[in-house]
Design a protein with these regions (language model features):
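Hydrophobic alpha-helical transmembrane segments and their immediately adjacent juxtamembrane loops
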Residues: 25, 31, 212-307
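Peripheral, non-transmembrane regulatory/ligand-interaction domains of membrane transport proteins
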Residues: 1-192, 198-199, 209, 213-216, ...
Length: 307
């Protein structure tokens, strides 16, 4: 599917799962290099920047947080950008909410004639990247909210359940960072390459602004990771305390019942005439002795601060 948006003299061709004919037509229409066409056909390209005489190819992978049967996971979405002086081509395999939202805003502003800031395709790319990065910031904030909810559950005594929850959130953060870390190289290379490109030096502040947005995402990821580490340490500490308490109780119970078991076994040895087993009241005497031993053991444990 191909959607075309325009603002003033700038055209934006947005392709979703383009066919071979779509790609061939775009390559021919804008006189693109055959290697650019190959990039549009490929869906597994690492983030990179290639600058040609009249246009530039930018490949980025954007992490998106999606709901998968009640749990969340990070899914990578590759976007290919081709930037010319007066055109921008985007190619992707699936719909991305941030891009759909940006397209609606652009069409609305175009009809109302509100936005005077778009003078060439570089400005269009800048505002689209701002929208994409804002969507990523929203996803990280949602992950942070999940950590806050986990924190509440930890202090409600649900430490064992939170082990899996924290592990899932940790996986999200790892996937998010793995996908975005290479963006920095693209923006740094763009700052060097675009200084003498068809957009001119005036576009450099826009690239710096995009890089600043990336740095904001990186900083937010680091802060969220620190919160995760702190919560995991707290959860593990509380879980260890509970487990140690259970072990302590079981150990004390064993010490209490061990002498009782020993006393009871003395009166059940076969083949030996054991006294105090011939009369009915003897049974009550044995039980009384066992109770006295239990009370003494408990008293001793409390005196030693074991209970």
């Amino acid at each position: 599917m191909t959607n075309t948006h325009s603002y003033k003299n700038v055209a934006w061709i947005d392709m979703i799962s383009p066919t071979e004919d779509d790609i061939s037509n775009i390559v021919k229409r804008y006189s693109l290099h055959p290697l650019v066409g190959e990039e549009l056909r490929s869906n597994n390209t690492l983030a990179k920047l290639c600058v040609y005489d009249e246009y530039a190819l930018i490949v980025l992978t954007v992490p998106t947080r999606v709901n998968d049967e009640g749990s969340y996971k990070i899914v990578d979405r590759e976007i290919d950008f081709i930037l010319g002086k007066n055109f921008m081509i985007t190619s992707r395999t699936t719909a991305i909410d941030s891009i759909e939202y940006f397209a609606k805003i652009l069409d609305t502003n175009n009809m109302l004639g509100k936005d005077e800031r778009i003078e060439h395709a570089g400005h269009l790319f800048y505002f689209l990247m701002k929208r994409l990065y804002q969507g990523m910031i929203d996803d990280i904030e949602n992950i942070k909210d999940a950590l806050v909810r986990a924190e509440s559950q930890i202090f409600k005594g649900n430490e064992r359940k939170m082990v899996e929850v924290l592990s899932m959130i940790s996986r999200e953060l790892i996937d998010f960072r793995q996908t975005t870390r290479i963006h920095r190289d693209v923006w740094e290379e763009m700052l060097q390459s675009f200084d003498k490109s068809f957009f001119g030096r005036d576009f450099t502040p826009y690239v710096k602004s995009i890089k600043d947005e990336f740095n904001k995402i990186n900083e937010l990821l680091l802060n969220t990771k620190e919160l995760l580490v702190d919560l995991r340490e707290t959860n593990d500490s509380l879980l260890d305390t509970k487990q140690n308490e259970i072990v302590r109780i079981l150990t004390l119970a064993s010490f209490i019942f061990l002498p009782l078991t020993f006393v009871a076994s003395l009166f059940t040895i076969p083949g030996i005439d054991v006294p105090m087993t011939t009369e009915k009241w003897h049974w009550f005497a044995i039980v009384g002795i066992m109770i006295i031993i239990s009370v003494f053991t408990v008293f001793k444990f409390k005196k030693m601060n074991w209970m």
